[in-house]
A protein has these predicted regions:
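N-terminal Rossmann-like NAD(P)+-binding subdomain of aldehyde/semialdehyde dehydrogenases
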Residues: 20-126
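Nucleotide-activated sugar donor-binding and catalytic core shared by glycosyltransferases
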Residues: 27, 66, 168-170, 174-212, ...
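A structured beta-alpha segment of the ubiquitous adenosine-cofactor-binding alpha/beta core
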Residues: 87, 91, 104, 122-129, ...
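Conserved small-residue-rich beta-alpha loop and adjacent elements
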Residues: 107, 111-184, 188, 216, ...
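Conserved NAD(P)+-binding/catalytic subdomain of aldehyde/semialdehyde dehydrogenases
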Residues: 136, 190, 197-246
Length: 249
C-alpha cells in the first residue's frame, strides 16, 4: 500500500510557490481571527459545542459513510492493502465511537485557567503557572479519519482554533467530518473557523504549513516516523511531537 510521501519538494528550482503561500496565509488569517474569540469562550459554551458536534456526527452518519466510500474506492483502485484500507474505513459503529469521544472530551475538567507550581516568595509575592490557550494549533496527520474529530475536540476544549491537514487518502472523509463539525459550531453560535481543513492535498502545501509561523502557534505531527521527522526538520513553527498530542493547552 502507498503511504504518504513526506520527502516534500518545492516547486521548480526549490522556490516556494507563491500560490501555496497565499493559500496558507489566507487560512492562517481566518484561523487566527477565530482563535481570539475561541480563547474567550466559557467552558459551558465549549462543552455545548462538543455535545452538538457529537449529535451532528451521529445524525449525519449516512452522509459520512457515503463520502468515506469515495476514499475506500480510490484506495482500492491504487492497490492499497486491506489492512490499511481498514484504517480508512468508517462504519456506523466507528462514527458512534468518534461521537462518544467528543462527549468524553466535554466531560473532562476544564484545562483553561488551572494554576500549577504556585510558590510564595519571601516578600509574599505568589508566582505560579497558569494554563491559557495557545491560539492556533496546526495538526498534520495520516490516514485515520477519527483523528479529525479528536483533534477538533481537544483543541476546542482547550480554547484553541485548529488547522487540520490530513492524508490525501482520506480527503473525502475529512471534508465531510469537518463540514459536520462546522455546522455544529454554527448551531451553537461559535465561529466556524475554529476548525479549518486544508483541502488542497498537494504535498507542497503541507510544507507551507510548516512555514506559517505568523499565524500557527504550535504544530503537531501525528503519524509515522517519516512524517514526524519531516515536520521536526522543516518546520519554523514550534513543534510538539506525537506523544504530546493530548497536551494542547
Amino acid at each position: 500500500g502507498r503511504k504518504e510521501d513526506w520527502n516534500i519538494v518545492y516547486g521548480r528550482e526549490g522556490k516556494r510557490e507563491e500560490n501555496h503561500m497565499k493559500y496558507m496565509e489566507q487560512i492562517g488569517m481566518r484561523s487566527k481571527a477565530a482563535s481570539r474569540s475561541i480563547g474567550l469562550l466559557g467552558q459551558n459554551r465549549r462543552n455545548e459545542a462538543l455535545k452538538q458536534a457529537a449529535k451532528e456526527l451521529k445524525k449525519q452518519a449516512a452522509f459520512l459513510l457515503e463520502e468515506n466510500q469515495k476514499d475506500i474506492a480510490n484506495a482500492r483502485e491504487k492497490g492499497m492493502k486491506e489492512s490499511l484500507i481498514d484504517r480508512l474505513m468508517l462504519t456506523r459503529e466507528r462514527i458512534a465511537g468518534i461521537a462518544d469521544g467528543l462527549l468524553q472530551i466535554a466531560d473532562l475538567e476544564d484545562p483553561i485557567g488551572i494554576v500549577t507550581d504556585m510558590k510564595v516568595r519571601p516578600n509574599g509575592l505568589r508566582i505560579g503557572k497558569k494554563r491559557v490557550p495557545l491560539g492556533v494549533v496546526g495538526i498534520i496527520y495520516e490516514s485515520r479519519p477519527n483523528v479529525t474529530a479528536d483533534a477538533f475536540g481537544l483543541c476546542l476544549k482547550s480554547g484553541n482554533a485548529v488547522i487540520l491537514r490530513g492524508g490525501s487518502d482520506c480527503i473525502f472523509s475529512n471534508k465531510a467530518i469537518v463540514s459536520v463539525l462546522r455546522k455544529a459550531l454554527n448551531a451553537t453560535q461559535i465561529e466556524e473557523d475554529a476548525v479549518i481543513l486544508i483541502e488542497n492535498t498537494d504535498r507542497a502545501v503541507a510544507q507551507e504549513i510548516m512555514r506559517t509561523n505568523t499565524y500557527i502557534d504550535v504544530l503537531i505531527p501525528r503519524g509515522g516516523a517519516g512524517l514526524i521527522q519531516t515536520v521536526v526538520k522543516n518546520s519554523t513553527v514550534p513543534v510538539r511531537s506525537e506523544e504530546h498530542t493530548s497536551e494542547l493547552q
